[in-house]
């Protein structure tokens, strides 16, 4: 789903307006899922901005980040997608605060909640702070099978 979102949210005018799409994964196993996902798309992540953080003790701490270097021959910093991996749960207050913080007046936030069982996805959507929905936010909820085309599901929430 994240790669599909990256394809759909690509901005052809990035060079002039510097608009980026940020895709955030929120998962209690984000460290492992990040490694699987980044391993599958090594070349993309070598050229992309990304960061990894953990949500614990009611705060979100960014521990790792990457800025592309050595790609001047390709036109410099040209990938218009940023990636974030948050090791935590959508039920954590600091994670909800981060989603709310990300919903600036100019931002268009789409939250896709993709848990293995659809009833858990719906419960997670209902659990989100109501202020998030007041900020030009769209939520999409679905249950996902445990495997998609033979690959593990890389999910919990994307924005």
Residue ranges and their predicted role:
Residues 1-159:
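Cytosolic regulatory regions of ion transport systems
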């Amino acid at each position: 789903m994240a790669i599909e979102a990256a394809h759909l949210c690509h901005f052809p005018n990035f060079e002039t307006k510097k608009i980026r799409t940020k895709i955030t994964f929120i998962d209690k196993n984000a460290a492992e899922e990040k490694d699987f996902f980044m391993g599958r798309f090594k070349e993309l992540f070598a050229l992309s901005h990304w960061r990894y953080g953990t949500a614990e003790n009611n705060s979100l701490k960014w521990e790792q980040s990457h800025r592309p270097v050595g790609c001047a021959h390709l036109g410099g910093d040209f990938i218009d997608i940023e990636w974030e991996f948050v090791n935590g749960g959508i039920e954590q207050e600091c994670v909800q605060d981060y989603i709310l913080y990300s919903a600036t007046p100019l931002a268009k936030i789409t939250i896709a909640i993709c848990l293995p069982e659809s009833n858990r996805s719906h419960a997670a959507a209902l659990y989100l702070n109501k202020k998030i929905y007041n900020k030009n936010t769209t939520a999409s909820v679905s249950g996902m099978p445990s495997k998609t085309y033979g690959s593990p599901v890389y999910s919990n929430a994307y924005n």
